Amino acid sequence: YAPDITIGPDGKYYLYYVLDHLPIVSVAVCDTPAGEFEFHGYVHYADGTKLGEKEGDEPSFDPGVITEGDKTYLYLGFCGPGDTSRTGSFVSVLDKDMVTIIENPKLVAPGCMNKEFAPDFNEHPFFEAPSIRKRNGKYYFVYSSAAMHELCYAMSDSPVGPFTYGGVIVSNCDLGIDTYKDGKTPVAPGANNHGSIIEIGDEWYIFYHRHTNNTWYCRQGCAEKISFNEDGTINQVEITSCGLNGGPLVGKGKYPAYIACHVYKKDMGVYIGQSEVPFIKQDGADGDKRLSFVHNVTENSGIGFKYFEFNGVKKVRVFARGYGMGFIEIRTSMDGEVLGKAQVHHTNHWQVYDIDAAIPDGVSPLYITYSGGGSIEIQEFELV
């Protein structure tokens, strides 16, 4: 489950992972991060007992690691709602051999069944996916909360805590963002979330995932640029289609529909698995070169892309198929004015719909919505 990697004191790369249905942590080692890794050993106490098998241990899950000097800090945990046998995420300190525990597990973030430990976590208790980062002398504990769709963080001056809850970094359905909608309204199907923050050049990003195929088990990797306040805290970022682009996307040319950050239907619920909502899917197997597309776009639903730098766009060319009896519409906000539309035709082959739509110059979103009966699929679009 959700392995993590660190560079040991010897300069080698150590991969920490937990196998399905086993309570212990395995470690593999390699001279390069790309492999091939060789088995190194199991994380264990000084007496040889494996972590996870000692009386009182909680089963290991989702390892997160950071190495400083000769010490490696290993974070583990899973806390499902209603499970009183799990209390939160623990950190263990490992010796320079990368497997021997020299400081026993210590609770650093409470789960939803352990509200007395640190009340500041109670609205966003630990669920899974612990990850640790360091910036400007502060340690950032990033995790998935019991709400599942959000990645939260806590801060400390020490890798072993105590940690203070900081806030939400990102929600894969944009709950909590109220700049363009009500903060309780999802704009995509929410589900569990994994990821962390990392510095690339002079900028910091949050990596996370969202879901495809209307299931919890198909996922699409995403990234958003984040910023820090003077006190080191992080403001929640909205989900976009920009990824690592460093700014708005160029407002010309073709784009695949699967980069939509908003895949929504009016009055949809928060979590994935709902019927009659649009979702990203694919034809064929993983790895095929055929483009993914957005399936089941129906009345009062649509897909949104943030953001584009528009300049002189007069037409949007949409590639769609399906058995619809309505119109594809172009907007620059979810409920904004329809700038252009085209009537769809019954077909199971991809068709091109040229839609005259003069989009105002400047930075703004693009929304492709649908009105009418039946349903369609959207594969890509071109800004002309």
Pin down the residues of each PLM region.
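Carbohydrate-active catalytic/glycan-binding domains of CAZyme proteins
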Residues: 1-341, 345-384
